[in-house]
A protein has these predicted regions:
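ABC transporter nucleotide-binding domain
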Residues: 180-269
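Catalytic Walker B motif of ABC-type/P-loop ATPase nucleotide-binding domains
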Residues: 162-165
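Walker A (P-loop) phosphate-binding loop of ABC-type ATPase nucleotide-binding domains
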Residues: 45-49
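Conserved catalytic motifs of ABC-family nucleotide-binding domains
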Residues: 158
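Conserved ABC transporter NBD signature motif
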Residues: 66-74, 81-82
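Conserved ABC ATPase signature
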Residues: 137-141
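Conserved ABC ATPase "signature" region
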Residues: 106, 110-133
């Protein structure tokens, strides 16, 4: 088995500007590795490039340049094998209201070419607590159940990697926590999870490693622990008219120093004191 579920090297995707003049990069020279068996968070605001990243991996968008390897398969050299290694759960609740969950999964399994004797539909329904609703019309399911049905459809061909695109966007806290439980359950059963989100709380709660994407570039990629430690340390610089006494107890505690341009720099923990209080 590969050490990395997904390995990305210098991946770029450019699109034409809406006015037809010139181009913009939705992804700009992105490189990252997603460890096998991890819950990996791709964090960023709307328009950061998260959906473009997913669409390239899923074969829905053609990259401009770079390399992407999914479960040991290069997406250019082995497109079918790489796509079959992925299950993608879209943000939109797209279900057929006239199909039951069991019928939906049977249909999805057929589309993936899974033979009837190899289908594990009852197991998936049971794992996602949809067994009692297996024969109910999908239109009668609650919002949380519909989300879980989308997860079930993505897992029907037993992919080793599951991508969840903004799975809790627009849902309440109770439903969000409920979905987190199922994500952990899937991961404990061996599935590598890739979670795109703009909720810092969600990434902090679930993920082992987090990459922050903004304007098509990776701003930071590190373990959750390293990112949280970075968040505990901030620096502020201000230009002062008069040189302060650096031996003052508060300035000593903040590790203050001053340069030749009379710029005073202090380090602080934003959980203890904020920049306004310092100023």
């Amino acid at each position: 088995l590969p050490d990395d579920a997904i390995s990305i090297h210098n991946l770029s995707k450019k699109f034409k500007n809406p006015d037809g003049k010139g181009f913009f990069y939705a992804l700009d020279n992105v490189s990252l590795s997603i460890p096998r068996g991890s819950i990996f968070g791709l964090l960023g605001p709307n328009g950061a490039g998260k959906s473009t990243f997913i669409n390239i991996l899923a074969g829905l968008t053609i990259k401009t340049s770079g390399e992407a390897v999914v479960w040991g398969n290069n997406i250019d050299q082995h497109p079918k094998a790489s796509r079959s290694s992925l299950g993608v759960v879209p943000q939109e609740l797209t279900i057929d209201p006239f199909f039951t969950p069991k019928e939906s999964l049977e249909q999805q399994a057929g589309l993936y070419g899974v033979r009837p004797k190899d289908r594990n539909i009852d197991y998936i329904l049971r794992m996602l607590d949809l067994e009692d609703k297996a024969e109910a019309y999908s239109r009668t399911l609650s919002g949380g159940m519909r989300r879980r049905l989308l997860v079930a459809k993505a897992m029907v061909h037993r992919p080793p990697i599951l991508i969840l695109d903004e799975p809790t966007a627009g849902v309440d806290i109770e439903l969000r926590v409920q979905l987190w439980k199922y994500v952990r359950k899937l991961n404990e059963n061996g599935t590598t999870i890739i979670l795109t989100t703009h909720y810092l709380e969600e990434a902090e709660e679930l993920c082992d490693k987090i990459a922050i994407l903004d304007k098509g570039k990776i701003v930071k990629s590190a373990s959750k622990q390293d990112l949280l430690e970075d968040a505990d340390s901030k620096t502020i610089s201000v230009k002062v008219r008069e040189t302060p006494d650096l031996n003052h107890p508060i300035l000593l505690e903040l590790g203050a120093n001053i340069n030749d341009n009379n710029e005073l720099t202090v380090n602080f923990n934003p959980k203890i004191i904020n920049s306004r209080e310092i100023l």
